[in-house]
Amino acid sequence: MLCSSFSVSRLAIPAVCILIAFLAYTSQIFFLYFEDAPLKEDEVWRINILAICIWICYYRACTVDPGHVPKGWMPSDRERLKADRASGRQRWCRRCEAYKPPRAHHCKTCERCVPKMDHHCPWTSNCVSHFTFPHFARFLFYAVVGIAYLETRLWQRVSKVWGSRHLPSYLGPSMGQIGHLFVLFVTNSLTLFALSLLLLRTLWSLGSNTTTIESWEIERHETLLRRARRLGGSLPGPGGISVHITKQEFPYDIGIWSNIRAGMGGSANVLSWFWPLARTPDRSTGLEFEENGFEDPTVSWPPPDPDRIPLPPMDQRDSFMYDITDTSGTSGQIDIEAFNRRKEADLRRRRAPTEIERRKPFHVRLEEYSNGSSDAEADTGSDDDSDHGEEGWKNSEGERLRDFGVDEEAEFYDEEDIPLALLIQQRAKRQHLSQ
């Protein structure tokens, strides 16, 4: 019986290694004994050189540290930080108890904020980030090139076997060889198809300087714009606030050449982009990124999202009270149902700060607003219903934030609860610099 701590994800790297070895080396054994069309010497060299490149790039994609936010790091742009706080953007990570740089996200698996996090890849058991993306992209490139080359060699043998299908069996390959060829060809073809799609997606991200998480954020922003147009340009936020939604351009698309250069470690040497032993991007980078200047300098990404704005402090929320309505026209009577609803909503708002107040999906809240429910009743849902909260919003491909390895609670419900000690420390540092 497997131990309770065992996870299937631990088998991912061994499975990939077995697949690489199976395609790269058992295929050569097959070619060695396939008398009708043995491999030429130059073909053997090509297969093995490509296999070495795949092994090196995969090893580095698995083992290179995806990076972390330096202890005590603070944003250098104070004006943007103030604007972020005003708009509710999550720049403070409650999990790490530290500021998050632009494009950084808290990975649930790595349990830290990762600079320019793209996604947590289950096949490398590592985050694809500012520091590991070049190795990951090279691995995909050499894997597709190597598998495509092997596909052409296998197809030649498949064609020969098919062309001699009417000859006596003793003149052709054995049943074991045919079975081996069939398994090699099917496995290689399926792997080539899957990795080709992933490589194309990665190249698109590289050319547009957009991570998979940011692609999700762009689609989320477009959804919020459509919702806002239906409701007069604004959307309701927590605590009954109204958030004006305007179109915001993605700031990190700085031109295809500059995008590729930035994604591949900042080097302008094209050959280094393909070199398996190329150095990892400098560890001093990954905290600030060049922008295209289409938006005001104080505006940061991602755009304001009413469902990701922190709940107002307790002293700024509505205090507990009951509704008194005059149903008879002569004397006030207590509406018991409204009283109980307000009481339950107030108790939910007064939970311990470690608990999460989840927001219901937009279509549910919209229906409840139209039915006359109060903001507090319509806003928050049960903790047990987490899979159906607004943090479960999916893009057109059916992906939600947790599919990229992101800690959804930290991204959607993290409060700007910056410790008082840190605020005092920041103030003292500013006073020291001004002297």
Curated annotation (Swiss-Prot):
Region (Disordered): 359-408
Ranges of biased composition (kind: Acidic residues): 376-388
Topology relative to the membrane: Multi-pass membrane protein
GO molecular function: protein-cysteine S-palmitoyltransferase activity
PROSITE patterns the UniProt entry points to: DHHC
Bias type Basic and acidic residues, positions: 359-368, 389-405
Catalytic activity: L-cysteinyl-[protein] + hexadecanoyl-CoA = S-hexadecanoyl-L-cysteinyl-[protein] + CoA
Catalytic residues, chain numbering: C121
Keywords: Acyltransferase, Endoplasmic reticulum, Lipoprotein, Membrane, Palmitate, Transferase, Transmembrane, Transmembrane helix
Stretches that traverse the bilayer: 11-31, 49-69, 130-150, 180-200
Domain DHHC: 91-141
Topological domain ranges for the Cytoplasmic compartment: 1-10, 70-129, 201-435
Family in the record: Belongs to the DHHC palmitoyltransferase family. PFA4 subfamily.
Domains (record comment): The DHHC domain is required for palmitoyltransferase activity.
Function: Mediates the reversible addition of palmitate to target proteins, thereby regulating their membrane association and biological function.
The protein's name: Palmitoyltransferase pfa4
Taxonomic lineage of the native organism: Eukaryota, Fungi, Dikarya, Ascomycota, Pezizomycotina
